[in-house]
Every structure is written in structure tokens, then in C-alpha cells.
Amino acid sequence: MLIAIVGKPGVGKTSLLQYLKDNYHFSVFYADSFIHEQYQKNNPGYQLIMDHFGKEFVNQTEVDRKKLANYVFSDDKLIEKLSLVTKPLLIAWIKSLKTQFQKKLALIEIAVMLNYWNEYRSLFDYVIKLERDDQLVNLALQQRNSHKKVKDLIKEPNCKIDTIFNNDSIATAALKLIKLLETFLERNKCRCDCCHIQ
């Protein structure tokens, strides 16, 4: 069973999934990390960036992510282009995880899904959106020196999504998420041992 974890930058998606992995032994995956792996030389993402954006955005070993980010953040059309270029890689990866986790539970952080709902939604059994007060989001983005435009990259969904608010401790958010996952498993009447939450 694949569960998508979505939300705007700075809401704590990565921290929450890491906490669940460390403390509850969940299988967790990160779309951004997958794409970063694909940006290594001899991987498909490296060639795609070179083909679609030019040789100036790659070096001897990998895509120059900082240079690429500075370039694409200057224009919404370039952000869209980058997403379209990497989308086939992401979809193939998610499909392989779907096969691998047919009888297991896995959480995948994929913020960009909210911008391409129709392409990604059918790949997941459930979607959970993480939200946080704006003041906490701004603080989180400042602490990691994120580009100012990052906050607005992810669109608000135009449909109802199960939502968890991450305004307290990460442990509190984790317990909320686990409770929601338990309702999903009950809804699916999942009986396999590997899907039970410990």
C-alpha cells in the first residue's frame, strides 16, 4: 500500500517521515532524493538535464543542482519544464514501488504531486496532506535558507485530502498520522501482517 505525503515546503514532511522511520520502522521514500540520485552522471536524469537545459547545468559527476535551481526559479515556465522533464522518471519509480509494496505499507514524500494531481493520484492508495501555520513555515524555510519563491511552488489542491496539522511536536504529528493510517488499513480491511502498524 502506497501512501503519498504531500504539502507545501516547510510544513515538516521530511522530518515527519524520518521520525516515523527511526521510531516506528516505517518504509519511507522521498521523491526529491530519488531525483537527486537520477542527477548523478550515467543516470537518466543527468542526460535529461543536459538535453533539455544545456551542458552548463552539469559537471563531471552530476547535475549542478544549485545552478539549475537558480535558473529555473527565475521563471514559472522553466519550473514547469523541469517538472515535465523529470515526471516520467518519477512515475516509473513510483510504479516500481507500487509493485514492491503490494502487501506492505510505504510512505512517499512527493510534494510536486499537488501540481500534477491527475498524473500521480492513481499511483497511490491514499494521500495525506501535511499543513502548518504560516509563521512556522516561514521559520522553517529561513532555517534552511530556502529560496524565497520555494514557498509558492506547490499549489493548493482543489479537492478534499485527508490533512494533518503539524503545529506541535513532530511526535504529536506522527501519532496523528499513525491514527489516520490505521483508519486506512481498517477501510481496506487489510489482514496481512506486514501492513499492521506496530
UniProtKB/Swiss-Prot annotation:
SUPFAM superfamilies named in the record: P-loop containing nucleoside triphosphate hydrolases
Enzymatic class: transferase
GO biological process, one term: coenzyme A biosynthetic process
EC number, as in UniProt: 2.7.1.24
Any GO molecular function: dephospho-CoA kinase activity
Keyword Protease: no
Catalytic reactions on record: 3'-dephospho-CoA + ATP = ADP + CoA + H(+)
InterPro entries cross-referenced by the UniProt entry: Depp_CoAkinase, P-loop_NTPase
Subcellular location: Cytoplasm
Gene Ontology annotations for the cellular component aspect, listed alphabetically: cytoplasm
Source species, domain of life: Bacteria
Stretches assigned to the DPCK domain: 2-90
Alphabetical UniProt keywords: ATP-binding, Coenzyme A biosynthesis, Cytoplasm, Kinase, Nucleotide-binding, Transferase
HAMAP family in the record: Dephospho_CoA_kinase
Name by which UniProt lists this protein: Dephospho-CoA kinase
Organism of origin: Mycoplasma genitalium (strain ATCC 33530 / DSM 19775 / NCTC 10195 / G37)
Classification lineage: Bacteria, Bacillati, Mycoplasmatota, Mycoplasmoidales, Mycoplasmoidaceae
